[in-house]
A protein has these predicted regions:
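Conserved acidic catalytic loop of the alpha/beta-hydrolase fold
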Residues: 133-152
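Conserved hydrolase catalytic core segment
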Residues: 150-189
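N-terminal cap/lid subdomain of alpha/beta-hydrolase-fold enzymes
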Residues: 56, 60-116
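Catalytic His-Asp charge-relay segment
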Residues: 289-296, 320
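Alpha/beta-hydrolase
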Residues: 198-290
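Conserved alpha/beta-hydrolase "acid-adjacent" motif
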Residues: 301-307
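Catalytic active-site module of serine/aspartate enzymes centered on a nucleophile-bearing elbow/loop
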Residues: 318-350
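Flexible "cap/lid" loop of the alpha/beta hydrolase fold
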Residues: 179-208
Length: 350
């Protein structure tokens, strides 16, 4: 089991930048690694000894605090003004952007089980099964550590939306509002089917000593579920070319390039942990009493519109916002203009 490999001490804050003459929307940047209660009990059984959670808080602490969490590839660096390419939500979050950091302080963290500096599996290690509830409990412990009694909102997309719902069920008094984008109270069986094939591919490759190759293939398959059929038709409807006696279709270059990129930065074990966690996700929506805005993308193959309409019907205090995007499930990364109106509700301003 892997702990942090960070260059700062546990339970101590590293001040990345001060608030002296800050850039607008930035303020101080602080990050650290929190030692979670040990052993940390897990929802599906077992526990994690000496578990650690890496976090990053950007902005004026006097502003409303918004927790921003995304898909299983997301991490604590939501945006970064000095190294923009490092921010996983860089097209949506920042000063003057859809999620405007001039109006809130932003808290991110590395998921348990994921690539990053939180506790996760080592190479060839079978990690305990993780639930979205486990991530929610880690977030609650982080808020205790930072002495934040109540946050303004959680903006959660994809897996992050699942964690937001789990937090809302378990710790509703600690958050004023949830924004859930492309995430339901449970996984759709067809989406689980796609992910189960991906996981089987990775496990088979690990047994053959070729885990990275298996992850590359799994990611290539996953890419076919993230975008809409309209986008694939617009981008890749061209004849194949003959390469080395074999036909290569235009879409293959895209899929396998994305697969190689992913396999170069993510370990197979980390992918397996969080992919499984998505499919284990199941919360009781009737117990999420926090006001909740649910954003559904009509073209989303992984989280169908009908599922989110049903979720909103079960949530006691919820509204549904429907958008349309050729980016499908990835719309939360690519549609700042459509998302800005819902982000504008998060700051608590009159």
């Amino acid at each position: 089991m892997r702990g942090c490999g960070a260059a700062w001490e546990l339970d101590r804050v590293r001040l990345v930048s001060s608030n002296s003459d800050p850039q607008p929307g930035r303020g101080p940047v602080r990050e650290g690694v929190l030692a979670l209660p040990s052993p940390l009990p897990l929802h599906h059984g077992g526990s994690l000894p000496a578990a650690q959670l890496a976090w990053r808080l950007v902005g004026d602490p006097a502003l409303p605090v918004v927790v921003a969490i995304g898909g299983i590839s997301a991490h604590r660096r939501v945006f970064d003004l000095e190294q923009p390419e490092q921010g996983w939500w860089r097209e949506v979050v920042g000063p003057g952007q859809a999620l405007d950091t001039r109006r809130c302080a932003l808290l991110g963290f590395d998921y348990l089980g994921a690539q990053g500096d939180s506790t996760a599996a080592r190479a060839d290690e079978r990690f305990p099964s993780l639930s979205s509830y486990d991530q929610a409990e880690a977030l609650a412990a982080l808020l205790d550590h930072l002495r934040i009694a109540r946050i303004r909102a959680i903006a959660g997309a994809s897996y992050g939306g699942m964690v937001a719902l789990a937090f809302g069920e378990r710790h509703g008094r600690r958050v004023e509002r949830l924004l859930v984008i492309s995430a339901g109270d449970r996984a759709h069986p067809l989406a689980t089917a796609w992910r189960s094939v991906q996981r089987r591919t990775v496990r088979f490759a690990l047994q053959a000593g070729r885990g990275a190759d298996g992850l590359e293939l799994a990611r290539a398959l996953a890419m076919t579920t993230y975008r809409s059929s309209e986008e694939f038709a617009a981008r890749f409807d061209a004849p194949p070319r003959l390469v080395g006696g074999e036909f290569v279709f235009p879409v293959e270059d895209y899929l396998y390039a994305r697969g190689r990129d992913y396999a170069a930065r993510v370990r197979p074990e980390h992918f397996l942990s969080l992919s499984e966690s998505i499919d284990l996700h199941r919360v009781d929506a009737t117990r999420v009493t926090v006001p909740c805005t649910v954003v559904a993308v009509r073209e989303d193959l992984l989280v169908p519109l009908g599922d989110l309409r049903a979720l909103v019907a079960r949530l006691p205090r919820a509204e549904l916002v429907e958008i349309s995007s050729p980016h499908g499930h990835d719309a939360f990364l690519k549609e700042p203009a459509q998302l800005k109106p819902v982000f504008d509700t998060l700051y608590g301003e009159q």
